[in-house]
């Protein structure tokens, strides 16, 4: 259920790693970050979790094939939502890369259904 008044104390913000929110801001505003996938050939990595920025550029320099990306599966969003609610959030605001470029927004929507969509504000950044 959506709280009558959304505050910093009862609301958590969830973003995907394509937003490139600096770590200091993620920490300051207690944001949770869902990793997009970076794919080099047959190898898939969770952006910023299994592949640092330095590792990304090193792999790119060493690879003959350019990397691609993929949307996070709904389970990654569900994990972030579960963490937010376990830590006391009453409401979750989700901001994703535009649905015109990625299926990330759809993954966020699908995961929200597990918890009751009235507990969410989902914002497609298009």
Language model features by range: what are they?
Residues 12-76:
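N-terminal glycine-rich anion-binding loop in soluble enzyme alpha/beta folds
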Residues 35-37, 123-126:
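Short beta->alpha connector loops at strand-helix junctions that form conserved
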Residues 96-119:
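Short Gly/Thr/Asp-enriched flexible loops that form oxyanion-binding sites at enzyme active sites
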Residues 33, 94, 120-122:
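Conserved beta-strand scaffold positions in the cores of enzyme catalytic domains, especially
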Residues 4-7, 79-90:
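Glycine-rich phosphate/diphosphate-binding loops that line cofactor/substrate pockets in enzymes
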Residues 74-84, 107-110:
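Short, charged beta->alpha transition segments
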Residues 15, 94-98, 124:
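Short beta-strand segments
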